[in-house]
Amino acid sequence: MYAPASTRSWQAGRERVLYRISDYRDCQSHGPTIAERVWTAWWQDSGLKVGDVAEHLQDMTNPHKLPTGFVAHDGDDYVGSAFLIHCDLEERPQYLPWVAALWVEEGRRRSGVARALMQAATQRAAELGHEASYLCCQRDLEAYYINCGWTVLERGVGKHDLTMLTFSTNI
């Protein structure tokens, strides 16, 4: 079973900043912030309301099935989050599971938080018996994910011209 990542640290100038990756079910107090970030980044033009996204988070409280979520936090402060879900790209429903809604607060970016969140999600996928995880992104983010160990499967997918990537969990 997934164990929360140990406390990680990084140096920002002279300030030492710590964060921890936890299962969403242990950090549900961050739910309203996560819902707002996810809604603002990906759903505000879709007709969904923030409350709809918050309601979806209720489905992420069972560690033995999808969907599930992960939270990066510094004590009570939200740092970032990621989901592991059934499908994130309606044009490719045959692939499962998907790392989705990866978000890191602007002041905490470029510090390894996103990579740690992806690692937690892909580790959970392996624990659930999946040999690979999938992710989609805009073309300008493709190089970042490749650098994190993901492999491009397909480019130009769907109406948003997304890149689809995979990560082998080697179970």
Model feature map: region roles:
Residues 4, 136-139, 148, 154-171:
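C-terminal "cap" of GNAT-fold acetyltransferases
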Residues 104, 110-123:
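Conserved acetyl-CoA-binding loop-helix of GNAT-fold acetyltransferases
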Residues 1-33, 170-171:
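Conserved N-terminal entry element of GNAT/NAT acetyltransferase domains
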Residues 29, 35-58:
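Conserved GNAT-fold acetyl-CoA-binding loop/helix
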Residues 125-137:
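Conserved GNAT acetyl-CoA-binding A-motif
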Residues 69-71, 77-87, 98, 103:
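Conserved beta-strand in the GNAT
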Residues 60-65:
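Short loop/turn motifs at secondary-structure junctions and domain boundaries
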